[in-house]
Amino acid sequence: LCLDGLVPFHRYSQGAYNHFYTINPNEIGTITPGSTGLGNYVYDGAVGNIYDTPGPDPSLTVPLYRYVNIHNSRHFYTTNWQEIGTNTVGAAVGDWKHEGIAGYIYSTSQPNTRPFYRYYEQSNGAHFYTSDPNEIGTTTPGTAGKYGYVLEGIVGYVA
């Protein structure tokens, strides 16, 4: 497994229910832990490393699509664009507008990778993603952890 070309996947937060993830820290303007950038997003740190291109072995990676809710600016990330219904940048389906590919992650577990978990908090309609299961406290699908987040599953794998 070649890890060349990996870049940090940065997480920013606006409280417990609005998170933004990017490989481009210029979108928010800071990578200083705890500092506030554009949109009042606070830098949390990197949640892992992903590729900005399909990587040295494209057969092992998949695009991680980024969508924004047009009503509340919350973001949603998935490797399965059919969950929203479009993979056309700028197109909107329902409440979600496709912003592009956030990066490329492994579709299956590889050496030196860890799961990238997706959680959902229903009352706020918020998603949370992490490679550290201790942040929410559960890795059992359907089980609620901290802040009411329920594990939906593993999106893919990050280094």
Walk through the language-model features, giving the residues of each.
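Extracellular glycan-binding segments that recognize GlcNAc-based cell-wall polysaccharides
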Residues: 1-159
